[in-house]
A protein has these predicted regions:
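Catalytic-core elements of nucleic-acid end-processing and repair enzymes
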Residues: 1-366
């Protein structure tokens, strides 16, 4: 099928055209200990909160992701990619670069899942390291790693996983596009495809929206593979994956890590950010009938001891000219088609759409 051919442009129901990589027919997710619930970071922050609080927490997460997009747009390769190759999947990028979202990571590469199931993230260095004896023996749950597995025809939007979803929407006048935060896309896996920043395709990444979906532990579409952790296994996998570089590459965006972490904790937003959250975040319109209602509620909220504020002007996260040049130097000059196979398969209307995006971004075809 053409949909399984790497380099094919596919239009997704969330409104993005993505360039696919080859499908391996299976989905995996690795976790380095047993958890009671495997849920996206946003859902974990909403646990135990009222529906009112959950809506505000969601709006803040969406605004932070939007600010992330505005920041990375300063990097030459990001607007160029959107102008010439495919749409930027900001939610997937935000998920892979440390922002709270309603998305859960999956991969179609077993080794990638095994790496995440046997190694530990180091927040200080933004990298992974092998498990130590202390890590493994910390609790009864940390003695075991878990890998979730499902055939991709069960979950994949491109390979049968969307059949029931399409049947339910045959007579639905709302044809989308659908926000990940709407709940309409829950429980299906979507290929992230190739993106200008590298983590997503290095990890053969898929995302599963879980705004309302059940935790993986209770999802009978997944089998759960539990194994005993050991330092020997962890070190062996760590070395096999080139100390994590094969799936967690050291790239230009890492030079702005401090800025990304500032955005991840942001409490000051623009009116444009708020409008985006109100619309794209699918804020409950019965609870907040107008954007003014949302503004009033969210500015009364404290996050980590600080009140949220909304201002008219855009929030700028400055980066020095030299630092930005260093980042650009790591991306500019690369043949962006190399990793794709030097060919993009697309329909004429998709090519026309890309040309229009180029004109929107640069004012002309380049």
């Amino acid at each position: 099928m053409i949909k399984n051919t790497g380099g094919t442009v596919i239009s997704m129901p969330f409104g993005k055209n993505i360039i696919t990589f080859n499908s391996n027919r299976h989905f995996f997710r690795g976790e380095n200990q047993q958890y009671l619930k495997s849920l996206p970071s946003l859902r974990r922050k909403q646990e135990g909160k009222s529906k009112y609080e959950c809506e505000l927490i969601k709006a803040i997460a969406v605004m932070r992701s939007f600010q992330f997009l505005k920041f990375i747009w300063k990097i030459d390769v990001v607007p160029f990619w959107e102008a010439k190759l495919s749409d930027i999947n900001i939610d997937a990028l935000a998920q892979h670069y440390g922002f709270d979202t309603c998305l859960l990571d999956l991969t179609n590469d077993f080794r990638t899942a095994l790496f995440f199931a046997t190694c530990k993230y180091d927040y200080k260095t933004d990298s992974y390291r092998p498990l130590t004896k202390k890590d493994i023996e910390a609790t009864e749950n940390s003695k075991y790693g878990v890998i979730f597995h499902s055939p991709n025809w069960v979950l994949d939007y491109l390979n049968g996983g969307s059949f029931e979803w399409h049947m339910h929407r045959l007579n639905n006048p709302d044809k989308g596009p659908y926000s990940f935060y709407s709940g309409y896309l829950g429980g299906m896996a979507f290929q992230i495809g190739y993106q200008p920043l590298m983590r997503c395709h290095h990890q053969s990444g898929y995302i599963m929206p879980m705004m309302n979906a059940t935790p993986l532990q209770n999802d009978n579409r997944f089998e759960k593979l539990r194994f005993l952790q050991s330092e020997e296994l962890s070190n062996r996998v760590y070395e096999m994956m080139d100390k994590g570089k094969k799936i967690f590459p050291h790239e230009g965006i890492g030079k702005s890590l401090d800025i990304l972490r500032t955005i991840q904790k942001a409490v000051i937003f623009s009116e444009d950010d708020l409008l985006y959250a109100y619309d794209y975040g699918v804020v409950d319109k019965k609870m907040f009938p107008t954007i003014d209602n949302l503004r009033k509620a969210i500015t009364a909220l404290q996050v980590d001891g600080k009140f949220v504020s909304i201002q008219k002007d855009e929030i700028d996260y400055p980066i020095s000219t030299s630092a930005l040049q260093e980042i650009n130097d790591e991306y500019n000059g690369r043949n962006l088609l190399d990793v794709i196979g030097n060919m993009i398969h697309q329909y004429p209307e998709q090519r026309w759409y890309r040309e229009q995006r180029c004109i929107d971004i640069y004012g002309k075809l380049i």
